[in-house]
Amino acid sequence: MRLFTHGQVLALLAFVNTISATPSFSTNSYPAHPAEPVSLFSQHQPQAPLGLWTRLRNSVIERVWGVPPQQRHRGGNKHQYPPFSAPASLRARYGDDVVLRFKLQTADEVKALVEASNILFLDVWSSTDEWIDIRLAKDVVPSLLGLLPKSLQTTHVPLIRDLPQTIYESYPSPSQSPSGRERGFLPSGEPSSDVTNIFFENYQPLSVIVPWMRLLASMFPSHAQFISIGSSFEGRDIPALRVGVRPANDQKPRRTLIIEGGSHAREWIGVSTVNYVAYSLITSYGKSKPISTLLEQFDFIFIPTINPDGYVYTWETDRLWRKNRQETSLPFCPGVDLDRTWGFEWNGNATGDNPCLESYGGDKPFAGVEAHQLAEWVKEQTEQRNTKFVAYMDLHSYSQQILYPYSYSCLYQPPNLENLEELAMGIAKAIRLTNRKTYAVSSACGGLMASQKKKAKPETFLRMESTGGSALDWFYHDFGVKYAYQLKLRDRGSYGFLLPRENIVPTGKEVFNAVMMLGRFLLGESNAFQELDWDAGFQRPKKDDKPILNDDDDDDADTNDDGIGRKDDSWIPDEYKGDNDRDESDGGWAFRRLRKR
């Protein structure tokens, strides 16, 4: 049990009192037409008093949606609660939008779909060499099909038939249950296991995340520090946690890893996952020898969202907003894609010159304010703070992929390709042994599905959007970070960006184990770390004590240990049912020992 000094306790109490005296954050701006309230019960139900953090979360939901305290709905979890219709404001904004998946076979099909999506200004959700997911209104479907070759007119399937309803169910629901677990919202001295911490039972708005980060740092000051990377276009801090224990007399450059999420505002699972990994490392220090060793050897910079303006906008106005919120040359098309604005090979595919495009990278390199702030921060840390950045992990969604450089072109290979692939394969296997989830491994230029079923088709490398100017390429090429990856998290399309909240903890476990594998790889084969029981540091799935580092295949298990699944999946095409539970053969994914020192 952790002991706090008298001064720390007083500071903590003062902080909590400040929050409890503030029912909501008045600095937030809320939509002009909030969602209509939906009543769960027809008659009044007695309620137990709600605790501090639930009141804080409820106040955010009430202010955003305009829901009176006595008329809170319990949407956001259709697996446990009865379904409710999406409010009129969501129907008005998203209409009868759907998400369709198109299967791709030839380069001509890719080219036709690229041209059609640009003509109709469609929202491309995800793309690989096998399929492309596109959001569009139902009444636009005939126009799209009319622009496509016959081969594509019959090879599309619906992934989301009712987008407003799915969006409505993705928002967290204000709790009306007794507050017996309220203390679970606060950081504790125990590492997170399963869903014991209420913070990870729902996606959280920025106005809850930032106080939580500050409190976490105040409770573990020996190895956690709350910092700001810079300021966003709208003046918000870009919050981060620095986690690590640096020896007082160590004059060597401090090896540092960056774990970042939320570049694209609508990808909420990346934000929650960064927080989960940070929480797990911080609360496990001193209890797990492998984790303690990592924090003594490295600093970790956790940035839940580099795009705070966009993230707030997804909570208050448009759940599917992708870019940041800065002004462009067209007043009616604001925002810059923060993963297409970096300086290396900026706008490499020459398709991002239209501010209305989702992948618009700005009118010059580093036009995106927040990307420029992060680039300047890492330069300052290197030049003035004796820091050496050795790894970069950028969390996105969706499609379950582990991508390494380069993104801008498939014609060039990174010099340490073998090492990048080896580590990526080790990360993929650690994830698969966590929750039976298969993550593809590929170069980011194609975003290929590494199913091992067929070889990549170079002629299909024509992309649906610009892939130049990515953070992945800049950190690797211009900044010299040897191990740079982009992880596209769950799922493979059943929910896309609207991943249900039940996936927060399982996805967090997967990426936590990925970070552990990354740290183990970076420590290398030094004799000083030979005796560490690395498996003790990994988070295991429920009802399974199989070691994460076991090199044996485990392909005979086809169940989901986390119990995550869709109860009503009758509308899903048969070929996509259980697409998150496929457990394909390892192929060549064994964690090889071939890297060159």
UniProtKB/Swiss-Prot annotation:
Its cofactor is Zn(2+). One of its GO terms (biological process) is cell wall organization. Pfam families: Peptidase_M14. Residues 1-21 form the signal peptide. One of its GO terms (cellular component) is extracellular region. Residues 170-179 have a biased composition (Low complexity). Glycans are attached at N349. Keywords: Cell wall biogenesis/degradation, Disulfide bond, Glycoprotein, Metal-binding, Secreted, Signal, Vacuole, Zinc. Residues 202-522 form the Peptidase M14 domain. The keyword Zinc applies. Binds 1 zinc ion per subunit. Residues 563-580 have a biased composition (Basic and acidic residues). The keyword Signal applies. Residues 22-174 form a propeptide. PROSITE patterns: PEPTIDASE_M14 (PS52035). Residues 550-561 have a biased composition (Acidic residues). It is found in: Vacuole; Secreted. Its main location: other. Inactive carboxypeptidase that may play a role in cell wall organization and biogenesis. Belongs to the peptidase M14 family. This is Inactive metallocarboxypeptidase ECM14. It comes from Ajellomyces capsulatus (strain G186AR / H82 / ATCC MYA-2454 / RMSCC 2432) (Darling's disease fungus). The gene is ECM14.
